[in-house]
Amino acid sequence: MARRYLMTYGDELTGAILCGTGEQASATLFAGKTVAGILGAFKGQRYRSEFIRKTSFKGYNDRFEKRTENDWLTKDQSIVDWYNGHKFCTFGFTINGYKTLFEVLTYIQKQENYNKIPKNLPVYMIAGEDDPVGNYGEGVKHIYQQYKDSGIKDISIKLYPNDRHEILNELDKETVYADVADWIAGHM
């Protein structure tokens, strides 16, 4: 959502920090939109599909010990346990919510939309190297290169070794917060 915001309102910003961003294969997004459209037609837009919830996050936990279904979020087990026990964290989106998510992801991954981001907007990309959302750092590096190729002048990237998706809740979060504070101090 932050990347979509940059494409629409980037000229109103002083800088942007993208945390835990990623990308999905176009075919995956097309399939997701199609399935959500079909389910929405039969079940309604407010229906919550366990199938779409599970397939949307399928594989995210594959590289980690299977203690819970959300261990991909962070190495900090107390955070994962808190997340799993909180009703506002573990709900699935409605069909409309997933369809909108797939549409936004499709939009932000088009090269012509990268070009809508102001070239003078400072952007700092941070992510965990073990984050499946960012394809274990490779997706984040690809987005970084796309931003550079689109002409963004002040862009930097930092990948945190052994960190997963929620780097602001990781065991080394103090380092992450210090890096963010340093970037802000140098750009604002």
Describe each model-derived feature in a short phrase.
Residues 117-123, 150-153:
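Short, proline-enriched alpha-helix->beta-strand connector loops that line the catalytic pocket
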Residues 19-20, 108-109, 179-183:
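Non-catalytic cap/lid and distal C-terminal segments of serine-dependent acyl enzymes
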Residues 2-88:
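Alpha/beta-hydrolase-fold enzymes
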Residues 132-142:
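Conserved alpha/beta-hydrolase "acid-adjacent" motif
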Residues 125-127:
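Short beta-strand/loop motif that positions the catalytic acidic residue
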Residues 148-188:
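Catalytic active-site module of serine/aspartate enzymes centered on a nucleophile-bearing elbow/loop
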Residues 129-132, 163-164:
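Acidic beta-to-alpha connecting loop that harbors the catalytic carboxylate
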Residues 93-115:
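Active-site nucleophile elbow and catalytic-triad environment of alpha/beta-hydrolase enzymes
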